[in-house]
């Protein structure tokens, strides 16, 4: 009798979903307002000045959805029995209240009812990682930290690719 070595899928207890760059289009709005990519503004040492203005004018409340986000959210809502939660950064502790408030308004506007979790910087996301949890995030360092902490990380580039990878786990 032949035995095969079949890899078992881990039972996933929670999927954590980043907002900016995955569901909400931060970069598009930033470019519309400041005529440059956020990374370019960082290189020119102008990011914080613009980011403060971005927050003061409540831009997080009205960001557009990312391409494919509607389909991605639909899949997470209707086709999975795995709970999904939002895990989003507020950049730092000083900006925590303003950004988390704006992001809650954004979630409500888009009828996204997943439990929201906000952390005062992306470097704190790994604290939610467990071997049976998945994070979907567009930041490589977040994915690296998540995996080092024992979780499963999906580096989001687009929703078609992300859903293809996610379906291997759920």
Functional labels for PLM-detected ranges:
Residues 74-77, 104, 108, 144-147, ...:
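Class I S-adenosyl-L-methionine
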Residues 2-57, 148, 158:
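Active-site neighborhood of HAD-like aspartate-dependent phosphohydrolases
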Residues 88-133, 140-143:
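Substrate-recognition "cap/lid" segment bordering the active-site pocket of phosphatases
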Residues 126-129, 165-170:
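Short amphipathic alpha-helix with an adjacent loop that forms part of the alpha/beta core around
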Residues 81-82, 112, 151:
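Short phosphate-binding/catalytic loops that engage adenosine nucleotides
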Residues 61-64, 69-100, 107:
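Substrate-recognition element of Asp-dependent hydrolases with the DxDx(T/V) motif
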């Amino acid at each position: 009798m032949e035995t095969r070595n079949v890899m078992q899928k881990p039972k996933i207890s929670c999927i954590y979903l980043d907002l900016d760059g995955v569901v909400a289009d931060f970069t598009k709005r930033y470019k519309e307002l400041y005529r440059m990519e956020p990374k370019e503004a960082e290189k020119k040492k102008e990011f914080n000045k613009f980011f403060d203005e971005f927050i003061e004018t409540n831009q997080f409340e009205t960001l557009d959805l990312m391409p494919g986000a509607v389909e991605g959210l639909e899949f997470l809502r209707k086709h999975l029995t795995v709970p999904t939660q939002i895990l989003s950064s507020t950049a730092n502790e000083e900006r925590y209240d303003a950004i988390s408030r704006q992001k809650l308004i954004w979630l409500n506007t888009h009828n996204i009812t997943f439990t929201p979790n906000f952390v005062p910087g992306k470097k704190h996301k790994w604290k939610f990682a467990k071997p049976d949890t998945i994070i979907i995030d567009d930041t490589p360092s977040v994915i690296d930290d998540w995996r080092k902490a024992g979780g499963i990380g999906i580096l989001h580039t687009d929703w078609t690719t992300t859903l293809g990878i996610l379906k291997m786990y759920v």
